[in-house]
Design a protein with these regions (language model features):
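Short hydrophobic/aromatic-rich motifs at helix boundaries and adjacent loops
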Residues: 45-51, 103-105, 152-157, 205-207
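Residues that scaffold the ATP/ADP-binding catalytic core of kinase and kinase-like folds
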Residues: 101, 122
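Flexible, surface-exposed loop regions and adjacent strand-edge segments
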Residues: 30-38, 45, 105-116, 162-171, ...
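Face-selective signature of the C-terminal outer-membrane beta-barrel domain
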Residues: 82-96, 124-222
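Surface-exposed beta-strand edges and their flanking turn/coil or helix-capping segments
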Residues: 2, 18-19, 27-30, 103-106, ...
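Extracytoplasmic loops and strand-loop junctions of Gram-negative outer membrane beta-barrel proteins
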Residues: 1, 57-63, 73, 113-120, ...
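Transmembrane beta-barrel wall of Gram-negative outer-membrane proteins
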Residues: 2-22, 27-100, 127-129
Length: 222
């Protein structure tokens, strides 16, 4: 993680960048309940990173949940401006992106023959972009304090799956755009009474496309 903070009399800035790597999950070896084979992962799929394996592979460490590793990076940028004696503006920018994220539960499913059902089942890189502006100001008439937020968020992700014995990858692409306006107002009447009220408007635009892609099986691994 890398972060930088800068500030002056009327403004401040915060920048943060985080890069994370999460490895495959390890299970404990002690099974006090008496079921020694419970949860063991004896077979797994090596069909990742463009590789094509026709059959399931033997897991030389059954306590290791293979294909659960993934990477992620996050970027945050915030600005805080003092617009006047009674007003402040905050700008917020965020971006995050992951690698492919495998569905371990789906990759562990078995068919009627007791073999692994899916060669691939993963979420494609999840991308999230977010931008917002928040204006906070004071007044002595209709309210004591007000916060107005304009925000936009974009999320892209996909679901990808392919069964063993097939070279067709089923892909479901999803794109979501979210627009929102949020306003909050606060007014104190006396020491014991106060009023809080607000308004929120949102608009969600979702686009979903499904299609199939032919997986290159020229370099077939048995």
């Amino acid at each position: 993680n890398y972060s930088i903070e800068l500030s002056r009399k009327n403004w401040a800035s915060y920048t943060s960048y985080t890069k994370s790597y999460f490895g495959d999950i390890h299970m404990g070896k002690v099974r006090n309940h008496g079921y020694e084979d419970w949860g063991l992962v004896n077979y797994y799929s090596q069909n990742i990173n463009g590789e094509f394996f026709e059959n399931q592979s033997v897991n030389n460490n059954p306590n290791l949940q293979r294909n659960t590793a993934y990477k992620q990076k996050d970027l945050i940028q915030k600005f805080n401006f003092k617009v006047s004696k009674t007003a402040r503006l905050i700008l917020n920018f965020q971006f995050s992106e992951s690698s492919n994220i495998n569905r371990f539960d789906k990759l562990s499913e078995k068919n009627e023959e007791g073999k692994l059902k899916f060669a691939e089942w993963y979420y494609g890189p999840q991308k999230r972009s977010f931008i917002s502006s928040k204006l906070s100001f004071q007044s002595k008439k209709l309210f004591d304090r007000a916060d107005i937020i304009f925000a936009y968020q974009k999320i892209d992700e996909s679901r990808n799956k392919r069964k063993f014995g097939s070279n067709l990858l089923n892909i479901q692409d999803e794109n979501l755009n979210v627009f929102s306006v949020n306003s909050d107002f606060f007014k104190r009447i006396d020491r014991q009474k106060s009023i809080a009220y607000g308004l929120e408007l949102t608009n969600n635009q979702l686009n979903s496309d499904g299609f199939e892609s032919l997986v290159n099986s020229e370099n077939l691994n048995k």
